[in-house]
């Protein structure tokens, strides 16, 4: 029973970290990275489809992405989707492919993005702590129903705290790495 609670808490915390990593990957740094376009969608045969599912997105150099659609007619739609996204990018249509230069971030925008990183990370930490609270509540419920002893409950809560500390440290490491990427000029 206790092991199930611990495994469930750890799995849920890991999923929270994955979501945080995805959210942080969407925040644009000064460098080109294909994940920047992961949430940009186009209308493809009547459904909203991510660009990454209809084209190859490659890094041409540190500040330029190359997009090669699998169907020639999609270049215009992809260009329009990138322009209308909130990323502030201006792609160049080369006919059968696109080039997306990454403009350098100014100091003010960098600071805004660092604040956004901190906010996203704090949301991740709160989610992890909520999972800890739920797991501790489950442990207390078992103790209340006399299914485990007080020593077992204390040990389980200590283990949950260790898992929580480890996951929060990983979230902080993701944030620090992203902040460093943002501050590179």
Curated annotation (Swiss-Prot):
GO biological process: cytoplasmic translational termination
HAMAP family given in the database record: RRF
Protein encoded by which gene: frr
Record's protein name: Ribosome-recycling factor
InterPro entries named in the record: Ribosome_recyc_fac, Ribosome_recyc_fac_dom, RRF_sf
Coiled coil: none
Record's keyword terms, sorted: Cytoplasm, Protein biosynthesis
Intracellular or extracellular location(s): Cytoplasm
One Gene Ontology MF term: ribosomal large subunit binding
Family, per entry: Belongs to the RRF family.
Entry GO CC: cytosol
């Amino acid at each position: 029973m206790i092991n199930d609670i611990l495994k469930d808490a750890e799995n849920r915390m890991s999923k929270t970290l994955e979501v945080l990593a995805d959210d942080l990957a969407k925040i644009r740094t000064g460098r080109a990275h294909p994940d920047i376009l992961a949430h940009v969608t186009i209308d493809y045969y009547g459904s909203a489809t991510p660009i990454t599912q209809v084209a190859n997105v490659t890094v041409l150099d540190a500040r330029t992405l190359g997009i090669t659609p699998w169907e020639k007619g999609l270049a215009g739609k992809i260009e329009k989707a990138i322009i209308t996204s909130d990323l502030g990018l201006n792609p160049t249509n080369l006919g059968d492919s696109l080039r997306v230069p990454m403009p350098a971030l100014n100091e003010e925008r960098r600071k805004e993005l660092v604040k956004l990183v901190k906010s996203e990370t704090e949301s991740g930490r709160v989610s992890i702590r909520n999972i800890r609270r739920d797991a501790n509540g489950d442990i207390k419920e078992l103790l209340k129903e006399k299914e485990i002893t007080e020593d077992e409950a204390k040990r389980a809560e200590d283990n949950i705290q260790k898992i929580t500390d480890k996951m929060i440290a990983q979230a902080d490491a993701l944030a620090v790495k992203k902040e460093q990427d943002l501050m590179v000029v």
